[in-house]
Amino acid sequence: MPSIDLQERRKQRLRFQLRAKANGRPRLSVFRSGRHIYAQVIDDAAGRTLAAASSLEKPLREQLRTGADREAASAVGKLIAERAQAAGVSAVVFDRGSYLYHGRVKALAEAAREGGLAF
């Protein structure tokens, strides 16, 4: 299917641009599925995840109606910002993957900025 190939090419192109701009900063990676949204702060130099959050976590599942809306993305953004700062990370590079900066991805990014992450 050509759409999968194009999506993969878009993701790789964006990831290459991020590596050039990163200057040693960790990457805030976003993955969204039909039912949930996930975020990770990844240190590519060390090859390890510094912080992670998702709408699957029990405290968020109890307070959210669903894991697939902008409200859930905002909650995950605030949570990833708290956890990243607890891990000593204050500046990141935002990796939206192959997703447009719109809707849930935008809500997560704005909540992470409000939570104190700089990007």
From Swiss-Prot:
<keyword id="KW-0699">rRNA-binding</keyword>
<dbReference type="InterPro" id="IPR004389">
    <property type="entry name" value="Ribosomal_uL18_bac-type"/>
</dbReference>
<keyword id="KW-0689">Ribosomal protein</keyword>
<dbReference type="GO" id="GO:0022625">
    <property type="term" value="C:cytosolic large ribosomal subunit"/>
</dbReference>
<keyword id="KW-0687">Ribonucleoprotein</keyword>
<protein>
    <recommendedName>
        <fullName>Large ribosomal subunit protein uL18</fullName>
    </recommendedName>
</protein>
<comment type="subunit">
    <text>Part of the 50S ribosomal subunit; part of the 5S rRNA/L5/L18/L25 subcomplex. Contacts the 5S and 23S rRNAs.</text>
</comment>
<keyword id="KW-0694">RNA-binding</keyword>
<dbReference type="GO" id="GO:0006412">
    <property type="term" value="P:translation"/>
</dbReference>
<dbReference type="GO" id="GO:0003735">
    <property type="term" value="F:structural constituent of ribosome"/>
</dbReference>
<comment type="function">
    <text>This is one of the proteins that bind and probably mediate the attachment of the 5S RNA into the large ribosomal subunit, where it forms part of the central protuberance.</text>
</comment>
<dbReference type="GO" id="GO:0008097">
    <property type="term" value="F:5S rRNA binding"/>
</dbReference>
<comment type="similarity">
    <text>Belongs to the universal ribosomal protein uL18 family.</text>
</comment>
<dbReference type="Pfam" id="PF00861">
    <property type="entry name" value="Ribosomal_L18p"/>
</dbReference>
<dbReference type="InterPro" id="IPR005484">
    <property type="entry name" value="Ribosomal_uL18_bac/euk"/>
</dbReference>
